[in-house]
Structure formats: structure tokens, C-alpha cells
Curated annotation (Swiss-Prot):
Family the entry assigns: Belongs to the class-II aminoacyl-tRNA synthetase family.
One MF annotation (Gene Ontology) recorded for this entry: glycine-tRNA ligase activity
The protein's name: Glycine--tRNA ligase alpha subunit
NCBIfam families named in the record: glyQ, PRK09348.1
Any single GO CC term annotated in Swiss-Prot or TrEMBL for this entry: cytosol
PROSITE patterns assigned to the protein according to its UniProt record, in alphabetical order: AA_TRNA_LIGASE_II_GLYAB (PS50861)
């Protein structure tokens, strides 16, 4: 399949490229997240000493960015391609440029520039040194060296690559409207466009996000998710006796943190959160994320070494 001819071929080419580099090619996380970084394969696995390599597509929702399907390149639901490499390889930029070449953007034929743009996620308590990648004057991706996630220092530092798939596909296909993207690589009656797949949903979710979402219910959902996250962290915490040295319930707790974050984004889109309240909500989600990150470090995947502790 030609990555210049279809959206799905672009994704499959990136899958193949990063699989060849040793990454586990994962599936999208089955929850509403604002960015690929929220996937536990990045947020949690960036913590602790254990090496980790993964790549995946993540549907991402940013309710405030909806434009009722009338904007050619701004969406409330879109796709990111995420790569996480821990420890950060010394040739991360070279690997990234190789991925561009694989999808048809030869760095020798295009003006590829890296513009310094440090990254931060206030709700995740995460930040890193980073650069935007511009191709012939258009931003197509970002790469970041994680310094902190969940308010916890990353040791070793992890390298993260984030591709904006729609924007990248628009560039390689040479179209100006995201809904005109060829999705399946066929022509004529067999052609399926991005608009055929997503335009109606984009219109309807814009109405939901800005007009119809029940704000009283959303407020309750936020509080419920916050309480459940804390309750699960408490329930799974290591016991004082030697029979339970590991945390037993990190991922379910982190799911509740993700839910709280998405509900906050919906409330923000509905315009019912003041500037002061907004900072309070961000702090509450960040507090949950930090607690989940700390709990993850008490698991085998987080790198806790029980043999050394017992010695």
C-alpha cells in the first residue's frame, strides 16, 4: 500500500517502520483521551527504570476544538501516532527522519526544520524538552525528551514522538481539506474519504460538546471519577505485612484519572468553568495522575525490585 495514496496506508507504513525498530505495536487505548500521551503505554511506562519501546495510533478528543465540521483542518476528534522509546536513543532524530522517508517525505527533497518548543501537560504533571518538526513550512509532528511525568522525574529519560496523522496525510496527499483525504486508497465508486467516515460524527459531537452535554451530570461524573480513583489506589496499596509488597490496582485507578480529565475538557467546552475553577480542576486531575504514577512505581512493571528489598 502506498502511504501517499491513503490514510490507512500511512498508518500501516508507520506501524511497519517502528515494528522493525523493535517497538511493540499496540492498539489504541479504549477510553476518551485528549492526546496519545494519556495512553498508559506512555504515561505510566515512561516511569521507572525498565526499558520500553511502543508505537500506536490513538484517537484523541479535544472538545473545545470542534468546529461543526466546517473547518478544513481543525477537529474535536483526530488521530495521533505515538512512539515512546525508553531509554531515549541517541539517534532519535535520525529514526524520526527515517520514518518520514518511509511515508514518502524524503528529507533530501523537502525543507525539514526543527523548531524548539518545549512540551507540557498540566493535567498529567508532565513536561519535556522538545521540538516541533516543520516540513516545507507546515508543522507535522513533535518530539520530546520527557523530564517529568505525573510530577515524577523520568530516569532514564524517555523519547516521545507524536505525529499529527491528519495533518501529515494532508501534506503527503496534497489536499487542503481534511475531509477530502483518501481513506482507503481506492478511486471512483470504491473510494472512501475521511469525510465519509468522520464528517457526520464531527458535526454531531460538536453539538454535543458545545450545546447538549448535561453539565450537572458531568460535574457528578468528575467527582465520582475522582473518588473512585482515590478509593482504588487505597484499596490496592501495599499492605504492612510481607504478603503484599506490590500495588495491586494502578491501571483501574488510572482509568478513573483519564475519565476525570475528559469530563473536565467537556465542562470546559460547555463554558461552565471559570478561570479560577479551571486551575482548580487541572490541579485535581494532576493530583490523581501523580498518585497513579507513584503507585505504578510500586509495581513490577514500574521496576520495583523485590529481591533487593528482601536482601
Amino acid at each position: 500500500m502506498n502511504p501517499k495514496r491513503s490514510f490507512q496506508a500511512l498508518i500501516l507504513t508507520l506501524h511497519s517502520y517502528w515494528a522493525d525498530k523493535g517497538c511493540a505495536v499496540l492498539q489504541p487505548y479504549d477510553m476518551e483521551v485528549g492526546a496519545g500521551t494519556f495512553h498508559p503505554a506512555t504515561t505510566l511506562r515512561a516511569l521507572g527504570p525498565k526499558p520500553w519501546k511502543a508505537a500506536y495510533v490513538q484517537p484523541s478528543r479535544r472538545p473545545s476544538d470542534g468546529r461543526y465540521g466546517e473547518n478544513p483542518n481543525r477537529l474535536q476528534h483526530y488521530y495521533q501516532y505515538q512512539v515512546i522509546l525508553k531509554p531515549n536513543p541517541p539517534n532519535l532524530q535520525e529514526l524520526y527522519l527515517g520514518s518520514l522517508a518511509a511515508i514518502g517525505l524524503d528529507p533530501l527533497l523537502h525543507d525539514i526544520r526543527f523548531v524548539e518548543d518545549d512540551w507540557e501537560s498540566p493535567t498529567l504533571g508532565a513536561w519535556g524538552l522538545g521540538w516541533e518538526c516543520w516540513c516545507d513550512g507546515m508543522e507535522v509532528s513533535q518530539f520530546t525528551y520527557f523530564q517529568q511525568v505525573c510530577g515524577i522525574e523520568c530516569a532514564p529519560v524517555a523519547g516521545e514522538l507524536t505525529y499529527g496523522l491528519e495533518r501529515l496525510a494532508m501534506y503527503v496527499q496534497g489536499v487542503d481539506n481534511v475531509y477530502d483525504l483518501n481513506f482507503n486508497g481506492r478511486e471512483g465508486d470504491e473510494k472512501i474519504s475521511y469525510g465519509d467516515v468522520f464528517l457526520q460524527a464531527e458535526q454531531e459531537y460538536s453539538r454535543h460538546n458545545f450545546e447538549f452535554a448535561n453539565t450537572e451530570m458531568l460535574h457528578r461524573h468528575f467527582v465520582d471519577a475522582e473518588k473512585e480513583c482515590r478509593a482504588l489506589l487505597d484499596a490496592g496499596a501495599p499492605a504492612d505485612n510481607a504478603n503484599q509488597r506490590l500495588h495491586k490496582c494502578v491501571f483501574p485507578a488510572y482509568d478513573q484519572c483519564i475519565k476525570a480529565s475528559h469530563v473536565f475538557n467537556l465542562l470546559d467546552a460547555r463554558g461552565v468553568i471559570s478561570v479560577t475553577e479551571r486551575q482548580s480542576y487541572i490541579l485535581r486531575v494532576r493530583t490523581l495522575a501523580k498518585a497513579c504514577g507513584e503507585a505504578f512505581l510500586l509495581t513490577d512493571a514500574g521496576g520495583v525490585n523485590l529481591s533487593k528489598e528482601a536482601a
